[in-house]
Design a protein with these regions (language model features):
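N-terminal loops that bind phosphate or other acidic moieties
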Residues: 1-84, 88-302
Length: 302
């Protein structure tokens, strides 16, 4: 069962669904929900394969970045912002961007498989960076060039939004794992040096215990590298949600590593806790919602 279940359960129970914005950045099939489709050149289909070294045109990157910055400047200072993503192949673009920004991130980035395909991700990332004539572990690289070469549209939009909102003092919850670490790294690389401390103090990566405890990746070490690279204190927080006592096998499989994070699961679970509700109550709610979903006529249930 998709981790989107967690976000849906939280948003519905907390009455936040009307305040949720889904942004389509170029899906071949439009989301089956109310959403905002950005105009060209921001949304002109998916990015090309990162191995090409030409994932997006620079014009598209600049347009997405400026859109994010504009939204960040317009966001109310007294309203926290939660950013989530759903990007196919997103951990691969995350690794490629992190490498392009000069971080030794190989082996640290997670993935959707039970055991992340570190070798495959590294080969694709290195191939793309080489094709774009970008050095791995280089310092002083142009983050826009890295984004255009091996990034994805979400990263450009989210980095601009994180940069401007955080710099203005808006609390930003980067709901996710490796992909949101890459967004934070991009925001820090793009921001002027005198804004980075403020940015890092306001933007927090929020993930699940399943990802944080995964033996085949290391998000905490990834954040430590980001802290060292830009001389800030990158923040990571882990939600308490566990599914070990759920009735649904589909949810208990999270505890076995088959699902770890995605669609903002960790951030939404943390939002639930910040509202003063216990994590066990959210687990029970997800269990009931999962049972309803699996028994729905859409899936051939009763």
């Amino acid at each position: 069962v998709s981790p989107a279940l967690i976000g849906h359960s939280v948003l519905r129970q907390l009455g936040l669904l009307p305040r949720t914005l889904v942004v389509d950045l170029g899906c071949a099939v439009a989301p089956a929900t109310v959403h905002l489709r950005l105009p060209p050149p921001e949304a002109v289909g998916p990015a090309a394969c990162l191995s090409s070294g030409a994932a997006m045109g620079r014009q598209r990157v600049l347009a997405l970045l400026e859109r994010g910055r504009r939204w960040g400047r317009q966001w109310p200072k007294n309203e926290p912002l939660l950013l989530a993503e759903c990007v196919p192949g997103g951990t691969s673009t995350a690794l490629a961007v992190l490498l392009g920004l000069g971080l030794a991130a190989e082996g640290l980035v997670s993935g959707s498989l039970l055991q992340p395909a570190h070798g495959l991700k590294s080969r694709l990332a290195r191939q793309g960076l080489a094709a774009a004539c970008l050095e791995i572990d280089a310092r002083g690289v142009d983050p826009l060039a890295v984004l255009a070469a091996v990034g994805d549209p979400m990263q450009a939009l989210a980095a601009g939004l994180t940069w401007e909102a955080s710099a203005r003092g808006v609390p930003v919850l980067l709901a996710g794992g490796s992909q949101m670490a890459a967004v934070l790294a991009l925001a820090l690389a793009l921001a002027p040096a005198d804004q980075r401390q403020q940015l890092a103090s306001q933007a927090v990566v929020a993930t699940t215990a399943w990802l944080a405890e995964e033996p085949h990746s290391d998000l905490a070490e990834l954040l430590a590298l980001i802290s060292q690279r830009w001389r800030v204190r990158a923040q990571l927080t882990v939600a308490s949600l566990r599914f070990d006592h759920c009735r649904s096998q589909a949810l208990r499989d999270y505890e076995r590593g088959y699902v770890k994070e995605g669609v903002g699961a960790g951030g939404f679970a943390l939002l639930w806790e910040l509202s003063g509700r216990p994590a066990a109550e959210l687990a029970a709610l997800c269990d009931a919602d999962c049972e309803r979903l699996l028994n729905s006529p859409w899936l051939g249930g009763a």
